[in-house]
From Swiss-Prot:
Name of the featured protein: Hypothalamic heptapeptide
Source species taxonomy: Eukaryota, Metazoa, Chordata, Craniata, Vertebrata
Amino acid sequence: FIYHSYK
């Protein structure tokens, strides 16, 4: 699952 990993 992705939460903050877009940075």
